[in-house]
Amino acid sequence: MKVARASLRNFKRFQNLDLDFRNRATGDVASPFLIIGDNGTGKTTVLQAVALCLSMAAATTRSVRQFDWLGWVPGRFERWGRPVIELEVHFTGDEIEATRQAALRWFRSRDGEGQDQPFVEPADSPVVTVRMDGEHFEAGTREQLYQLRGRSYAAQLLRTDHTARELFDRLPGVFWFDQFRNLASPPNEEGADENGQGRVGFQVGVARLRQHLNRWQMAKIGGRWGPRDFLQELENLYRTVFNGRSFGLPEPMYRGGVPTPDDYYFMLNDGNRTYDIEEMSAGEQSVFPLLYEAVRLQFRHSIVLLDEVDLNLHPPLAQALVHALPRIGPECQFFLTTHSGAVASIISPEQTYRLPGGRLCL
């Protein structure tokens, strides 16, 4: 799934903005696509528009109030009039087929619940226009709208059928990482509830992540791993960006009693000494949530929005991250923002859009 065009009306600072996300030389839908501009010109706003519209259509965000992006203020959504967001979304044949298979498996799994209603098969349209008008959205037909809900079908199926995890590799979705991300950033599919409870304090967030990683680590050590080694996949991605670093063995916290995954540090190795994830550098903390979620949620064929891609990264590391994106999310379309000349220099000008305003610096 890729977005070729976007149109924003009365959305935050933009009264009227049209964007084309295709490579201006080849005409192909671009990835990565870089948005640059001075502070306050609306880079984050563009990413929010894409994430909000797609996640509402995909039923992963239930309302404007639930949209989880730090700095998003739902009470001002219609401050400048009724917002309209329109996206032109492209699908491959395999994505369409995978979504149809997931929808059918979900329908058949309901044990009679709702079986009196006919099965509505997602459409097979290679191009779908998704339109969000206020909080109402549409996609031509109901069947076309369901083309965006493959991961939602699979997530519901996964509650009762663990084999549904194999579906995610082929299903498109939308994921975003804001400019305030760190180890406490909430899991993508959970987000915040109606009262904004998706975010937690740093210590709680780190403890939650450490527990999840240690469960993977101990399952691997105990030989209880399934057909896919998620921990090894995560370490491989981590080493791709942070050359010379690796994962170490769990280190006990010595709290006494029978240890649980909460009672171990998750260790990393810099080639000289070891350290716990809580001791990560700011640059590592900005990248690790992307790597972890990419493995855990199996990013494929999806839209991934990464605000301030160079966040807390030395220029060579920022470039290493950009170069690693196709490996982090195969067949994904990445939307990036940056203030870094090092990042802008390695992305084609034909795949870069500069928002107007301010002084030209990139």
Identify the role of each PLM range.
Residues 1, 316-362:
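C-terminal lobe/lid and adjacent interdomain/linker elements of RecA-like ASCE P-loop ATPase modules
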Residues 1-55, 326:
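Pre-Walker A-like glycine/lysine-rich segment at the N-terminus of P-loop NTPase domains
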Residues 2, 181-280, 285, 292-302, ...:
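Extended helical coiled-coil dimerization/tether regions that scaffold
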Residues 29-71, 99, 281, 287-293, ...:
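Phosphate-binding glycine-rich loops of NTP-binding sites
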Residues 49-124:
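Conserved P-loop NTP-binding catalytic core
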Residues 109-242:
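Coupling/switch segment of ABC-type P-loop NTPase heads
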Residues 307-309:
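Walker B catalytic acidic pair
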